[in-house]
Amino acid sequence: MAAGVATWLPFARAAAVGWLPLAQQPLPPAPGVKASRGDEVLVVNVSGRRFETWKNTLDRYPDTLLGSSEKEFFYDADSGEYFFDRDPDMFRHVLNFYRTGRLHCPRQECIQAFDEELAFYGLVPELVGDCCLEEYRDRKKENAQRLAEDEEAEQTGDGPALPAGSSIRQRLWRAFENPHTSTAALVFYYVTGFFIAVSVIANVVETIPCRGPARRPPREQPCGDRFPLAFFCMDTACVLIFTGEYLLRLFAAPSRCRFLRSVMSLIDVVAILPYYIGLLVPKNEDVSGAFVTLRVFRVFRIFKFSRHSQGLRILGYTLKSCASELGFLLFSLTMAIIIFATVMFYAEKGTSKTNFTSIPAAFWYTIVTMTTLGYGDMVPSTIAGKIFGSICSLSGVLVIALPVPVIVSNFSRIYHQNQRADKRRAQQKVRLARIRLAKSGTTNAFLQYKQNGGLEDNGSGEEQALCVRNRSAFEQQHHHLLHCLEKTTCHEFTDELTFSEALGAVSLGGRTSRSTSVSSQPVGPSSLLSSCCPRRAKRRAIRLANSTASVSRGSMQELDTLAGLRRSPGPQSRSSLNAKPHDSLDLNCDSRDFVAAIISIPTPPANTPDESQPSSPGGGGRASSTLRNSRLGTPCLLPETVKISSL
Amino acid sequence: MGAVGNSSSLQTKQREPSKDIAWWYYQYQRDKIEDELEMTMVCHRPEGLEQLEAQTNFTKRELQVLYRGFKNECPSGVVNEETFKQIYAQFFPHGDASTYAHYLFNAFDTTQTGSVKFEDFVTALSILLRGTVHEKLRWTFNLYDINKDGYINKEEMMDIVKAIYDMMGKYTYPVLKEDTPRQHVDVFFQKMDKNKDGIVTLDEFLESCQEDDNIMRSLQLFQNVM
């Protein structure tokens, strides 16, 4: 029930007194009335702006946040007010809804933000009042459309790489639909485009009259008849290419039926069919007339260009979407033509030697006049005819001019939509790259922190780098959290490049070299790792002595430079490198359960910097700290090792 | 009684009269609109709070709450019959409450002006909720007396009873029969009409009601509605 009705409830109940004398049975007792607290003023503090309202006002809608007991969660006993950390401007509209019963939509705010506020306060968007409802819906629809386009662009665009297990079919189809994905596809795309052009030009050129060899009288033949073989060869070549393309598409299409029904495939078929029909049909005189007609269809090859040109597609789509306007145009034109043709015919009937022999003959005159062409092959000679002729030409302009703006605006809208989609697709890549960069920044912060020896005990506080000490409380806690995670999983965080390179190395089974550049590494976590599975590591070390390596800091640096990130190596304090043995022993992850999914990457020996010297590890545990074992046998290895330890 | 009418007709008459057809036509339209505006813009303000408090049985706080709700719903300060009907329709959605609302409106509108001001509203509520038995019964008699002639006859009673049954709607249990209202009226008249002359006067009404225990008890029901 509307809130306002609550106001009238006492009145309605009071008016029931009028029923009393008529009641044949005793009326039920009234419901127990709680001691009604006097109406009080509530203070709602929204981000500093105080709104005050009667409690009754808020109680009008008990199924919203402010009307129910949910608001008690936001009650601040000290100040005696309800505090919401939300947008105060939006709250104004929400509160007005309680007061007036109508929810108005703010014109200058983002519709999404408004929706979120409504959701927070427990108001359904359907409550938007009639005055603002249409605009609200329009804006919402526009937004949703844009978001959908975005998503679509993301998916269909040059989207994510196909899963490794995709079949030839899928790859082929993708190459056809998005020529930009691979070079071969691009080449194919341009080649077909070229051949379409060649075919169309050949069709045109073969009708040009070439001067025959000097003969008396010099005969003019169309080029097609003069060089029949050349043109036939060109035609064959084109048709072969088109046929091949069509068959390939048919093979690669995920849904053949749908492909067969699509417009583009129909165009393809129409383009190549005349040739084959021409081949099959024997060259006798009766049929050759039809055969010649078939050649007309060759011109449809030009429509194949619509795969190559987006503008053409847009035009086609526009015409399709303006079908009703075009229909109207056609209908009104037909009506006008018939009317005027009839009038002109009867007006010119009396004249001798007139061109207006029949009404259909007058159709031609009417069309030519209405479209303001005015060939002049048919001209009225009577005065009445001239008068009606002029009316005809004046009205023609009007009738044609009416639906045209609609079509134009449709085209413009669709075209701009397309432009926007393209632009967004292009920008999307840049956006994603930037976002990735920002994200990697935070992970790098942790890695940087690790390398700067931040993971050691706070004992040697002064020796810690300034950058380590100057982290905010939030960062400290965050890093501590990441560290805990590392300890829990016995994995370490590393960066993307290291991981992908490691992955590459594993699949390559590549040449690895052992380089024990422990000295330059914060050994803490790695020693943890190693001592986490010391026995295993040792065993493996012995067995796979040659197949392990560790990513030296130098190689890390090299990778950094490769990635364009320049990381200043933190001060290498020896103390930080000495693995605290008790650290490792504290670890309680069972080495047996632990999947030592460590990837080894080849360290290009040439780039091994000076720092990575084979140091004699202090503790026994450290010997194996440099060795990482890759259990190539385990199938579950690769998917799990999202973050790989890196030394 | 502060009746403030927003008539802006004064301002328009100050224009330079020209003899344009267009101008006369424009004026005509303008006046038409203004007449309509005048009717809607009339804003009514009630008497002071103290006076109302003296006249009714409500406290100041109760009057404040009542007025706030009233003003919120009817910013112009008056309720018209349409609003009454709408309100009742919302309370009784099953059936058709418009007839009863019409009678109710007439009962509220003591001055028969076609609109109920806040004073009327509050006065009636005061009687119904805080009044004496006598007052309540008299108010009810006034409600039943549709033509306000001081007597209730069978036709008036029929109308009232039918209106009440209309509020019930179609889906009732047991099923509503055609002559149920008539029977009800007959029972009523049998009880109320002491001298069996076919009409019920105020005294007969008061007497009969005071004899009936049920009615007396029920009258106390709506005491605490506020």
From Swiss-Prot, chain A:
SMART domains given in the database record: BTB
UniProt-annotated stretches for the region Required for dendritic targeting: 474-489
Expression sites (tissue/organ): Detected in carotid body chemoreceptor cells and in frontal cortex.
Composition skew (Polar residues), residue ranges: 521-530
Catalytic activity: K(+)(in) = K(+)(out)
Topological relation to the membrane, as annotated: Multi-pass membrane protein
Low complexity composition-biased segments: 510-520
Record's subcellular location: Cell membrane
Membrane-crossing residue ranges in chain numbering: 184-205, 231-252, 264-284, 288-308, 324-345, 387-415
Sorted UniProt keywords: Cell membrane, Ion channel, Ion transport, Membrane, Metal-binding, Phosphoprotein, Potassium, Potassium channel, Potassium transport, Transmembrane, Transmembrane helix, Transport, Voltage-gated channel, Zinc
UniProt KW Transmembrane helix keyword: yes
Quaternary context: Component of heteromultimeric potassium channels. Identified in potassium channel complexes containing KCND1, KCND2, KCND3, KCNIP1, KCNIP2, KCNIP3, KCNIP4, DPP6 and DPP10.
Main function: A-type voltage-gated potassium channel that mediates transmembrane potassium transport in excitable membranes in the brain. Mediates A-type current I(SA) in suprachiasmatic nucleus (SCN) neurons. Exhibits a low-threshold A-type current with a hyperpolarized steady-state inactivation midpoint and the recovery process was steeply voltage-dependent, with recovery being markedly faster at more negative potentials. May regulates repetitive firing rates in the suprachiasmatic nucleus (SCN) neurons and circadian rhythms in neuronal excitability and behavior.
Protein name: A-type voltage-gated potassium channel KCND1
